[in-house]
């Protein structure tokens, strides 16, 4: 939605033609933009990387207040829109129980949301090479079972059956 001037007319036309629509977002856009898009969407993939704003700022360069506010509004104001929250589980950043419990509490009570913990991978390292930028994660890897543990804690905390969360 960073290019809302292009995306919104496309979404509007797709909806008019009864074409299913979806977006993938981190939610770091003005609420009015997301709200306008939501009325034309069938599905939203919404990344939540961290619940703690200071940690989010440290890891991404921006706080998460706008992101979490937008997600809460989206879930509340568009209860018929299916939202799939996803978290790339990053070693040392959000691979802990504190994050999982906080996210589970945040999602609790919303029936229109699924959750998926995505295991960390190194598939994006070539982009850093292409941009001549150092890849700061080095050879870090996510231990087996960590993403599954985060998934289980979020599901249990929010009261979702594991099958319903995918």
Describe the residue ranges of each PLM region.
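Conserved AdoMet/S-adenosylmethionine-binding subsite of the radical SAM
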Residues: 1-118, 123
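Hydrophobic alpha-helical packing residues
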Residues: 14, 154-157
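Radical SAM enzyme core and accessory elements
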Residues: 156-166
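A structural motif corresponding to the C-terminal lobe/cap of the Radical SAM core domain
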Residues: 105, 113-114, 128-154
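A broadly tuned preference for mixed-charge, low-complexity surface segments
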Residues: 78-83, 99-100, 135-148, 166
């Amino acid at each position: 939605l960073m290019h809302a001037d292009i995306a919104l007319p496309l979404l509007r036309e797709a909806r008019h033609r009864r074409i299913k629509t979806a977006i993938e977002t981190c939610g770091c856009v003005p609420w009015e933009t997301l709200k306008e898009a939501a009325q034309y969407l069938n599905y939203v993939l919404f990344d939540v990387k961290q619940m703690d704003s200071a940690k989010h700022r440290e890891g991404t360069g921006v706080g998460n207040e706008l992101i979490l506010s937008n997600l809460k509004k989206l879930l509340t104001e568009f209860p018929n829109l299916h939202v799939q929250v996803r978290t790339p589980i990053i070693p040392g950043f959000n691979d802990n129980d504190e994050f999982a419990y906080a996210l589970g509490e945040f999602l609790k009570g919303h029936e229109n949301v699924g959750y998926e913990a995505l295991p960390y991978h190194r598939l994006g390292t070539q982009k850093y090479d292409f941009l001549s930028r150092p890849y700061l994660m080095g050879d870090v890897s996510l231990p087996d079972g960590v993403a599954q543990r985060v998934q289980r804690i979020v599901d249990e905390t929010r009261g979702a059956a594991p099958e319903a969360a995918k």
